[in-house]
Every structure is written in structure tokens, then in C-alpha cells.
């Protein structure tokens, strides 16, 4: 019997995400027929309702034999998440687990010992707190809202926001790396809108401390695949801000640093990841300051992805494109980021980005 080296792991898969490009090539290497639902890049929103979603599945002959690969887009779609969990196999973590862990206040209190803590929360507005909608993602539905339903108020923690990206196999974790997260500057409607990330170094002592906590967390909730945790450091305490038991934006940083990352996420292999380089990586998502019609000037920008079509109308506060950076030196990459944003703002009416860096 001869092994077919071109046979792929899955016959059919459905990718659900806001921004498909960073996952597309990796997934098509292992899937014969890939279907994509991406509200950011498709005219029709197939996640508008469960009925619309079911019609999309029927039209494309997508049934329970199709594997679901989830990144984003279902944060407030409870009925679609429940339907997918019941009828399909979800690569990585199921959507019930995603919903549970997306709210850190659902976590077992025994995880929060010593200097790993959660910000205080309140049901009432307080000027030192920020408003957050349950299952918020990417800085959306986070701000200073006093009158919306389905929100809570979280103690504001000053300082930079970081994240740790890791793989889990239900028992233990492998830390991929640590990142600083960036946000859009001077956006009144979305003051905490996520706008990119940059990889960081961490010494061995700190690495072991984080790994012990993440191993306990991963084992307790039997996590699978690519996950990330957003946090802040203040007064010698680590404040857990958000937990993402799913593919997230920092995947684009580590797909360049490790070999076959998507294979590990969907469970095709359980071995240790092989690092292919030790460079620093970063990316910046540019958001439209006003409605913007794409023209040829964007092609003057270097190393861009998630590129819109010429003539496409980008609505205010929606992503336009992504700038990508790499360097062998952590100081040089920050300079590249600053220069890249400056160049982009000369030709695109986009928001600036907060780049506080320690």
C-alpha cells in the first residue's frame, strides 16, 4: 500500500473569522475544500442570524462531516454557537468552553493566588472603571458606556497590555511567546480597539512562573490548541484581562516563527513545535477614520496584508489593511512600526496607534 503524500487531513472545513487571510494558506495545506465566513470581507453577513447561517450551510452542502475552525465573529451569537457545538466537530476548543472562558470571572477562584489576580468588577458605573460587554473581543464593546444593557464595569488597570500565546493539549502547555498589544489612538467610539501586537522576550525565571500557572489553567479546563491570555502588570501583580481559547490575532506572529502551527492547533500532531527563527515580529491593523474608498496609493506601502480591493468602500472604524514588520533587534522593530504608521497616515485617512513600550 502506497502512502499518498498529497492526501490532505480534512476533506472539508469551515473557517469562521474576522479577517481570513492569516489562516488561509496554512489551512488549505491540510483541507481539500475550505469554506470561509468572514463578515469583514464578505458583502453578506452569514452570521446575521441562525436562519441565515443554516441557509449558508445548506446552499454549500456543509454538513456534520465538515470540521469547524473558529477564530472570531460569534462573540454574541449564542444560538449559532450552540448549534455548531451540537452538530459539528470544533477544532481546538468547543464554543461552550470559548463562551465560558471568555469571561475571566467564570474561572475557578483557586487559580487566583499570590500575585495573579482579576480586576475588581461592579454592576454600577464608577469613574475608575471601564464598561465591558460580556464576550467582548478585540477591544470592541469596551469603553465608558453608562447606559447599555448586558455590560459590567471593570476596574481600570493602567499601563501596557500584554498577552501570552500558547498551545495546549489538555494536560500541559507550550508557551509560544509573549507580546505587547497595541490599541487605536483617539477613537471616541472604540477607545480600546485592538490594533496589533509585537513579540517580546522574557527571561527563563519569568517564563517558568507563567508556564506553571498556564499548565494549571489548561489542565483544569482541558484546553486544546492555540490560546492566548491578555494581561497587565501593575503594582507587582498580574491582572488577567481577557482569555481567548481560540485562534486570535497573535497567530500571525507565531506562524512565521514556528513550523506547522496549524497542525498543532487542530490536533494533527502532539509533538513539540519546532522554532524556525528567533526574529521579532509585529503587525499593525489600520482602521478607517472616516468612510474611505481604496485607491492605488495603498500599494506604495511595504509588506501589507488583508489588502482591500481597489474602489472598495471601507466604512468608518472598520479595518483597512495590516502592516507587517520583522527584525533581528527589538529596538529596530519599534522604529519600523513608527515609520510604517507614519507613512500610511500620509496616504490613508486612518487612526494613529498607541505604541507605549517598555
Predicted features along the sequence, with ranges:
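A conserved helix-loop-beta module that forms one wall/lid of the active-site cleft
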Residues: 85-146
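ATP-grasp fold ATP-binding core
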Residues: 111, 126-142, 150-164, 176-180, ...
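Short acidic-glycine loop/turn motifs at beta-strand connectors
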Residues: 146, 168-173, 233-237, 288-289, ...
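ATP-dependent carboxylate/phosphate-activation module, predominantly the ATP-grasp catalytic core
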Residues: 158-161, 165-221, 244-266
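Conserved metal-phosphate-binding beta-hairpin within the catalytic cores
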Residues: 218-252, 290
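Peripheral (often C-terminal) accessory segments that flank ATP-dependent C-N-forming ligase machineries
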Residues: 263-358
Amino acid at each position: 500500500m502506497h502512502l499518498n503524500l498529497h492526501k490532505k487531513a480534512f476533506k472539508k472545513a469551515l473557517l469562521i473569522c474576522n479577517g481570513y487571510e492569516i489562516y488561509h494558506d496554512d489551512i488549505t495545506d491540510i483541507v481539500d475544500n475550505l469554506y470561509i465566513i468572514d463578515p469583514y470581507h464578505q458583502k453578506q453577513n452569514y452570521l446575521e442570524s441562525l436562519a441565515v447561517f443554516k441557509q449558508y450551510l445548506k446552499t454549500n452542502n456543509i454538513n456534520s462531516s465538515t470540521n469547524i475552525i473558529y477564530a472570531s465573529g460569534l462573540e454574541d451569537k449564542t444560538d449559532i454557537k450552540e448549534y455548531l457545538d451540537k452538530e459539528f466537530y470544533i477544532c481546538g476548543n468547543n464554543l461552550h468552553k470559548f463562551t465560558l472562558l471568555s469571561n475571566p470571572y467564570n474561572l475557578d477562584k483557586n487559580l487566583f493566588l499570590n500575585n495573579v489576580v482579576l480586576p475588581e468588577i461592579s454592576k454600577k458605573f464608577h469613574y475608575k472603571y471601564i464598561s465591558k460587554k460580556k464576550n467582548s473581543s478585540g477591544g470592541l464593546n469596551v469603553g465608558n458606556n453608562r447606559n447599555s444593557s448586558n455590560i459590567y464595569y471593570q476596574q481600570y488597570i493602567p499601563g501596557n497590555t500584554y498577552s501570552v500565546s500558547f498551545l495546549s493539549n489538555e494536560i500541559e502547555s507550550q508557551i509560544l511567546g509573549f507580546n505587547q498589544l497595541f490599541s487605536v489612538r483617539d477613537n471616541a467610539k472604540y477607545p480600546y480597539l485592538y490594533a496589533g501586537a509585537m513579540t517580546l522576550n522574557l527571561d527563563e525565571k519569568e517564563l517558568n512562573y507563567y508556564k506553571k500557572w498556564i499548565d494549571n489553567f489548561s489542565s483544569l479546563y482541558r484546553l486544546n490548541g492555540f490560546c492566548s491570555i491578555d494581561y497587565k502588570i501593575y503594582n507587582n501583580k498580574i491582572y488577567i484581562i481577557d482569555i481567548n481559547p481560540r485562534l486570535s490575532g497573535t497567530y500571525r506572529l507565531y506562524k512565521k516563527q514556528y513550523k506547522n502551527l496549524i497542525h498543532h492547533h487542530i490536533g494533527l500532531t502532539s509533538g513539540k513545535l519546532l522554532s524556525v527563527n528567533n526574529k521579532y515580529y509585529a503587525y499593525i491593523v489600520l482602521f478607517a477614520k472616516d468612510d474611505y474608498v481604496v485607491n492605488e496609493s495603498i500599494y506604495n506601502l511595504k509588506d501589507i496584508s488583508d489588502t482591500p480591493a481597489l474602489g472598495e468602500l471601507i466604512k468608518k472604524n472598520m479595518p483597512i489593511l495590516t502592516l507587517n514588520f520583522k527584525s533581528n533587534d527589538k529596538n529596530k522593530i519599534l522604529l519600523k512600526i513608527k515609520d510604517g504608521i507614519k507613512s500610511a497616515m500620509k496616504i490613508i485617512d486612518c487612526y494613529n496607534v498607541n505604541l507605549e513600550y517598555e
